[in-house]
Amino acid sequence: AQAGLTGGEGLPNHRTLYALPDGPQVLAEGADSVVLRLRALEGRDVEVTKVLTFKRGSYVIDVGYEITNRTERPLATHAYFQFARDGRPAEAVEVFGVSTFTGPAVYTTESKFQKVQFEDIDEGKAKFVPRASDGWLAMVQHYFVAAWLPTEGVQRENYMRRIGADQYLAGVIVPVAAIAPQETGRVSTSLYA
């Protein structure tokens, strides 16, 4: 799973290094969650903190950004949340005569569950809802799934593409409201993993 911001120079992407705060970062006895606040090590005009919230007993991780605009002009940006995977099929497994699926999938209320074969991405024939205000995007392998779960009602753009020899991205882009000078904006989504 990868995440980052787009739309301006100096904004962190999925390769940006972050610093942890000093001291232990643990889920305390009796606590329901722990919040990790990671500070991006690059950027002077824009300060970015990645906020990860882990909840006891949950497979859902909240992933968010706090973006402080230190410039004298409004900042327009988007956040992306994606999965990177090779296109090799997982070992062949057949259950009751049915082969399992490996690849990206999108779910929306309107179009339901849409599995996409890596070959269809290669050939430009991938069929999935590119824009929606509900649903999720996942990477599926056999019985395992990881999914980005954007907030319901938030317009998002789903994408899938080949990025190299047998390497693929599947992700979702969500808007961040324009951030005025010297103000802080926030964006978040959830990761099921």
Can you say where each PLM-predicted feature lies in the sequence?
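Soluble non-transmembrane domains of integral membrane proteins
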Residues: A1-A193
